[in-house]
From Swiss-Prot:
It comes from Mycoplasma pneumoniae (strain ATCC 29342 / M129 / Subtype 1). The keyword DNA-binding does not apply. PANTHER family: ARSENATE REDUCTASE, GLOBAL TRANSCRIPTIONAL REGULATOR SPX. It comes from the Bacteria. This is Uncharacterized protein MG127 homolog. Keywords: Disulfide bond, Oxidoreductase, Redox-active center. InterPro entries: Arsenate_reductase-like (IPR006660), Thioredoxin-like_sf (IPR036249), Tscrpt_reg_Spx/MgsR (IPR006504).
Amino acid sequence: MLKKKVNNDAGKTFILISSSCSSCQKAIEYFKENNLSYTIENFYKKPISDKRFRDILSLSEDGTESLFSKRADQIRSNTNQSVEDLTIPELIKLIRERPSILRRPIIIQYNSSGIPKRMRIGYNAAEIKVFERSLMEPKVRTVKK
């Protein structure tokens, strides 16, 4: 009998932060004020996992473009390498070495099956309200024979 793998992200919202980030503090305050559940992940203290980074990429509408701050441009000018040219393992390594290149906060929400469904990067008072709405789960129809 196969054991079903438990997904620890199921139904959760994660706020990826750095401690000194004022936008991160605004996002946390918003979640507190609206009684929304969340888990904080400080990626300066504990690096972003490969899985979490891949989940973030899966929800990014423009690849890596919106993920990186202006500091990423400094990396481009110091090396002849563009962030867009890096492989995913190279990006993860770079982020672990220089977490300040990521925009913050990154808020990612998973459905009850543990599939990443929503993400916002940075703090925007209007856009963050999307996390107040529940995720719509697909309804399973039974077919009568």
